[in-house]
Amino acid sequence: MSHGGKRRSGDGGSEGSSYSPLVYLKRPYFRKSRSCPLAQCPDEDIDYKNKVLLSKFVSEYGRILPSRITSVSARKQKLLARAIKRARYLALLPYC
């Protein structure tokens, strides 16, 4: 009995090739590296009193944005987190 469906070529036929979705991606395991937006900024500029700079790295809900979103280096992310927490403690930035 036939199921009524048409058989497509490449559905595991006898060609010996298997389907791989990675064939259709340009570069499957390649991530484009982005430079740190604070690379030109010295460490002294990342300060708890600099509300304009700190507010760029805080979400609308008051949470610190992760470095995978902001593409900030690990060192600058640590300095930013410390400055944001100090600014929150001194009521310069909101907690939420």
UniProtKB/Swiss-Prot annotation:
It comes from the Bacteria. NCBIfam families: S18. Residues 1-20 are annotated as: Disordered. Pfam families: Ribosomal_S18 (PF01084). Keywords: Ribonucleoprotein, Ribosomal protein, RNA-binding, rRNA-binding. One of its GO terms (biological process) is translation. PANTHER family: 30S RIBOSOMAL PROTEIN S18, SMALL RIBOSOMAL SUBUNIT PROTEIN BS18M. Part of the 30S ribosomal subunit. Forms a tight heterodimer with protein bS6. InterPro entries: Ribosomal_bS18, Ribosomal_bS18_sf. This is Small ribosomal subunit protein bS18. Binds as a heterodimer with protein bS6 to the central domain of the 16S rRNA, where it helps stabilize the platform of the 30S subunit. The keyword Ribosomal protein applies. It comes from Anaplasma phagocytophilum (strain HZ). One of its GO terms (cellular component) is cytosolic small ribosomal subunit. One of its GO terms (molecular function) is small ribosomal subunit rRNA binding. Belongs to the bacterial ribosomal protein bS18 family.
